[in-house]
């Protein structure tokens, strides 16, 4: 059976993008961004705190890290919950030891399930981000916008009592969006989102409710991707992050354009006892280059980038 | 199954004859080089809302697959110029495997490549429009349109072809040869160019395009560590360089800016190029230059050698 002729028609073939979400531009061609105190590299660390329900339905698709075994998949349920009980405290200790700050992207349901965890997260004073309801509630193409709106509002309402400042940013579970997610995030009063991994600096993102900023949070450099999906050694994870840091520092100095390293960390991955020292080696490297690195909350980084001029 | 409706799939594509590596006439590259090195950056466009194809899903997640789309878009927004910087440093010109729609979406990227005297060859229209399910007339239209776009926007004749997303039909190579192409990158059976059979009987050549050293295959499919990828490139070079003392070999490094140009990966590629380009006897070529040289100097000898091998077989 042959394809219809419209398979060779291209209604969105035009200059720029084939959608209207953002303008086309290349990183190297943009006006330079500069960070406070003349630092070369903005360092955004994000720690994702996630709840993977045992009765995963996989509506839309199953987010990575989900249940894979026949019900009840105690193996994956407990390995994920480990991050919220044990792993997070190793990660927080490592941050504290290196005088680093991170943002905390937290599934809303965790605030209902584990208020004791949220009180401890609150005590860090770190910026908190919405991270969806749980890891079995992905925002996928075709999701009913009424349900999606409810998930977003419920998530933000649940986290609000524990956030030091009003929540401005969002990371969708599995970085997945429906056709309406950007509009719904804007309508919920959020300023920025981290889902699109197509850039290394913040950029302007259009919604029907007004402009959102996109703060790309690297997928290919995150622990779950490198250690979990690619099965690379923990030591190799550290090498890769260190190589990225060194490259971006060099590129920033060479071009006199500020760069950003955005690193997502999962306590259920790097919080394991055999992995935490490799995360600490990464933090040691950041500390060794502290004269050139500006470690800040993502909303501060976004403000500084905006301050440099209109975003791409 | 990509056989036209009603046809029985073939057990052998019939595109090349068996030709053992130990019995071939010597290939002499320009300047007596041992290895013809060519770098093939894929400059691709993946669509936000591609039409469905019953034989292959363009994106794994329900549309919009924001993660898949953004992962590829990174190459165009961030990656190309990092890769170009490394290639400039070592005097390497790219042979661009081009989603022809990129000429229209992102002419700024094309200008950067054209200014460096890079070659452009066809990789279809979009990397989310597959050959699967196309009639022969439709596939011909797609191939010819991609070649016409390349000529219109760059002034170059499109000499090479790599089917979009490596999606093929039984007629792909035939159609490209008939449309005026000189070489295909779609066959991975050799480390030297080889003649390829096409139904028109044109002088047509397969130029090695290594899938094993393709960054997307190594990083995405084989999940290789960045530093190991750099080492794999060096190891492949060492062997092809050694063998190239006796007869010229081809080394291709196919790249995708959305893979190789990540901050944790670009250094491994740079190290490998630094190592390779520190050797004398490396012909920094393009796909077109390799194909033309081979057609002019080695093709006829190759046909004779292949025929002689066939005669070894009992009748």
Regions found by a protein language model. Give the residues of each.
Chain A
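A conserved mid-domain beta-alpha-beta active-site/ligand-binding segment of alpha/beta enzyme cores
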Residues: 216-249
